[in-house]
Amino acid sequence: MSNQIKLLVGLANPGLEYKRTRHNAGAWVVEELARVHNVSMREESKFFGLTGRIQSNGDDLRLLIPTTFMNLSGKGIAAMAKFYQIKPEEILVAHDELDLPPGVAKFKKGGGHGGHNGLRDTISKLANTKEFYRLRIGIGHPGHKDKVAGFVLGKAPTKEQELIDAAVDESTRCLDILLKDGLSKAQNRLHTFKAE
């Protein structure tokens, strides 16, 4: 799968009040990758978000953090994919994942939205295809589905945040492996990682 990913998206809600909430974990991956590669993200209205570009092995990796609310994330993703002629299977969407504990992150191809409104809208705007890749950043689960909305829009306690940040850092390193050596090598490394 070497160099197949052409667009990396970090799902988030816009605005300072949401910046450090669990729901924005996907955006933290893109921000960290941009920082490591010394890339400035800039607002681009035609893509409804912050964009950047990294070159790896002569190939472009486009970066996008939608600045629409989470449930409208697909709008910018679809616009960017259409403009740069990027297929769904060349897209990797980083997002917060309730079903993984803090300190864990996993790659996945395809699948449903699992109740995640950002994924739901992405699937919808990509003509109902689910064949894009995901980078699932574990945030843990509040224990009851009625508590999920408040949980994802809340900030993690310090210890949990440190675990999430460690998983984001490792995910960023694994994205470099993915771009150079393909998914299986990146997966092998990331899927054995667990922050303590």
Curated annotation (Swiss-Prot):
<dbReference type="GO" id="GO:0006515">
    <property type="term" value="P:protein quality control for misfolded or incompletely synthesized proteins"/>
</dbReference>
<protein>
    <recommendedName>
        <fullName>Peptidyl-tRNA hydrolase</fullName>
        <ecNumber>3.1.1.29</ecNumber>
    </recommendedName>
</protein>
<dbReference type="GO" id="GO:0000049">
    <property type="term" value="F:tRNA binding"/>
</dbReference>
<feature type="site" description="Stabilizes the basic form of H active site to accept a proton">
    <location>
        <position position="96"/>
    </location>
</feature>
<dbReference type="GO" id="GO:0072344">
    <property type="term" value="P:rescue of stalled ribosome"/>
</dbReference>
<keyword id="KW-0820">tRNA-binding</keyword>
<dbReference type="InterPro" id="IPR001328">
    <property type="entry name" value="Pept_tRNA_hydro"/>
</dbReference>
<feature type="active site" description="Proton acceptor">
    <location>
        <position position="23"/>
    </location>
</feature>
<comment type="similarity">
    <text>Belongs to the PTH family.</text>
</comment>
<feature type="site" description="Discriminates between blocked and unblocked aminoacyl-tRNA">
    <location>
        <position position="13"/>
    </location>
</feature>
<keyword id="KW-0963">Cytoplasm</keyword>
<feature type="binding site">
    <location>
        <position position="117"/>
    </location>
    <ligand>
        <name>tRNA</name>
    </ligand>
</feature>
<dbReference type="InterPro" id="IPR036416">
    <property type="entry name" value="Pept_tRNA_hydro_sf"/>
</dbReference>
<dbReference type="Pfam" id="PF01195">
    <property type="entry name" value="Pept_tRNA_hydro"/>
</dbReference>
<dbReference type="GO" id="GO:0004045">
    <property type="term" value="F:peptidyl-tRNA hydrolase activity"/>
</dbReference>
<feature type="binding site">
    <location>
        <position position="69"/>
    </location>
    <ligand>
        <name>tRNA</name>
    </ligand>
</feature>
<comment type="function">
    <text>Hydrolyzes ribosome-free peptidyl-tRNAs (with 1 or more amino acids incorporated), which drop off the ribosome during protein synthesis, or as a result of ribosome stalling.</text>
</comment>
<dbReference type="GO" id="GO:0005737">
    <property type="term" value="C:cytoplasm"/>
</dbReference>
<comment type="subunit">
    <text>Monomer.</text>
</comment>
<feature type="binding site">
    <location>
        <position position="18"/>
    </location>
    <ligand>
        <name>tRNA</name>
    </ligand>
</feature>
<keyword id="KW-0694">RNA-binding</keyword>
<comment type="function">
    <text>Catalyzes the release of premature peptidyl moieties from peptidyl-tRNA molecules trapped in stalled 50S ribosomal subunits, and thus maintains levels of free tRNAs and 50S ribosomes.</text>
</comment>
<feature type="binding site">
    <location>
        <position position="71"/>
    </location>
    <ligand>
        <name>tRNA</name>
    </ligand>
</feature>
<keyword id="KW-0378">Hydrolase</keyword>
<dbReference type="InterPro" id="IPR018171">
    <property type="entry name" value="Pept_tRNA_hydro_CS"/>
</dbReference>
